[in-house]
Amino acid sequence: MKVETYLFGAVDVSPEKVITFPNGLVGFEQSKRYMLVHEEGPAEPSSFTLQSLDDPMLAFQIVDPVMLGFNYELALSDAENALLQSPSPEDVAVMQVLFRKEQDDKGSITPNLRAPLVINTKSRVGLQKVMETMRPNITLSNLSSSI
């Protein structure tokens, strides 16, 4: 299928590359189909673009929390497990959406720690896990030794 995007122009997307978020993402519930795009190169990509296939103007920068030194331990409800088609742990990718605070003139980018994306990499189905209270077990591993 050919998709027009504002970041990448016209892109051919094979159906097996589509990631479906049945409930959409918070604030963007109408967009349910996405593709992941990353810069080509010899190194592992540090971030990805999650491009909506339903809205060509909608794209998010996402990152593996491990790249930022975070390790999530998330408990999924029975409904979330069913939506993700009961994946085994090795088939799950947890990603964080990056955002820029509007009141920040420095243009700093922050990960959304309260609402990570959880994706079943085999079935290519995902959800946004919104945590009402911030109580995940997070391990920081990239701390500078000069602290």
UniProtKB/Swiss-Prot annotation:
* GO terms under biological process: bacterial-type flagellum assembly; regulation of translation
- The keyword Chaperone is annotated on this UniProt entry: yes
- Any single Gene Ontology cellular-component annotation: cytoplasm
Q: Which SUPFAM superfamilies match?
A: BH3618-like
Q: One Pfam family of this protein, by short name?
A: FliW
Localization annotation:
Cytoplasm
The UniProt record lists the keyword Chaperone: yes
Keywords of the record, alphabetical order, are: Bacterial flagellum biogenesis, Chaperone, Cytoplasm, Translation regulation
State its role. Acts as an anti-CsrA protein, binds CsrA and prevents it from repressing translation of its target genes, one of which is flagellin. Binds to flagellin and participates in the assembly of the flagellum.
Q: What family is this? A: Belongs to the FliW family.
What subunit structure does UniProt give? Answer: Interacts with translational regulator CsrA and flagellin(s).
Q: What is this protein called?
A: Flagellar assembly factor FliW
Q: Which organism is it from?
A: Dechloromonas aromatica (strain RCB)
Instruction: Name the gene that codes for it.
Output: fliW
